[in-house]
């Protein structure tokens, strides 16, 4: 996973119970050395966030991710297809994305804005996938060229990206991550679905291999 280099103020001191491992200070730690799951003791807000899957699914997974993060791409390539096929498409899991663009990734925030704006054209997940698929091209080509390749209305997209409301959505995600001491990408919060637009659960850092990620899902579903 990749870590966000931000200090957490006193408002976040009792919100997240983290167990520390030897990888805690490594900015580029291997995916198999992430911290063990911890409990998020207060709630995330889900209203208006991009969601995949049924709102009636018994389990919700919230992802904090960065479009330039290599471990986030690994999750997209090696885990999400199986997750979608076995759990999202079958109505067992609802998958929700939140943005955590890290400050040293210059294209991450524009990519997050573009994806948010693709939702206006009902194409959020299409651009989400394209951005990860072409991650190595982000810096040299930019998000607009990638959006053009999947036939998005790029004029409309650019207008939306420049709006204050779009930046506010991303900054709200960043503030929420800081509040909950979520500093690494990708980070997942896995817990039972609720009807009040809020979420809490176990916090998992890193792009786990699919068998390990699947085991965590099955464990949560068996608790239900």
List PLM regions with ranges:
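C-terminal cap of thioredoxin/glutaredoxin-like
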Residues: 1-21, 26-30, 64, 145-224
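Short extracytoplasmic/periplasmic juxtamembrane "stem" segments immediately C-terminal to an N-terminal membrane anchor
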Residues: 26-47
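A short beta-strand-turn-helix
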Residues: 42-59, 87
């Amino acid at each position: 996973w990749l870590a966000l280099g931000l200090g957490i103020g006193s408002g976040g001191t009792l919100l997240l119970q983290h167990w520390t491992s030897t990888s805690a200070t490594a900015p580029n730690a291997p995916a198999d050395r992430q911290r063990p799951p911890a409990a998020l003791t207060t709630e995330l807000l889900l209203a208006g966030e991009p969601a995949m899957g049924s709102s009636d699914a018994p389990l919700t997974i919230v992802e904090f991710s960065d479009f330039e993060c290599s471990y986030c791409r690994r999750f997209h390539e090696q885990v999400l297809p199986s997750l979608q096929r076995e759990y999202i498409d079958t109505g067992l899991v609802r998958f929700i994305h939140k943005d955590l663009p890290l400050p040293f990734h210059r294209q991450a925030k524009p990519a997050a804005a573009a994806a948010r704006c693709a939702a206006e054209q009902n194409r959020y997940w299409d651009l989400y996938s394209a951005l990860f698929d072409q991650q190595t091209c982000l810096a040299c080509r930019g998000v607009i060229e990638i959006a053009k390749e999947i036939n998005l209305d790029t004029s409309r997209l650019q207008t939306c990206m420049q709006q204050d409301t779009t930046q506010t959505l991303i900054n709200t995600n960043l503030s929420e991550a800081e509040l909950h001491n979520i500093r690494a990408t990708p980070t997942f919060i896995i817990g039972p679905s609720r009807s009040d637009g809020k979420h809490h659960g176990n916090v998992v850092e890193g792009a786990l291999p699919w068998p390990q990620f699947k085991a965590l899902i099955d464990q949560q579903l068996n608790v239900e």
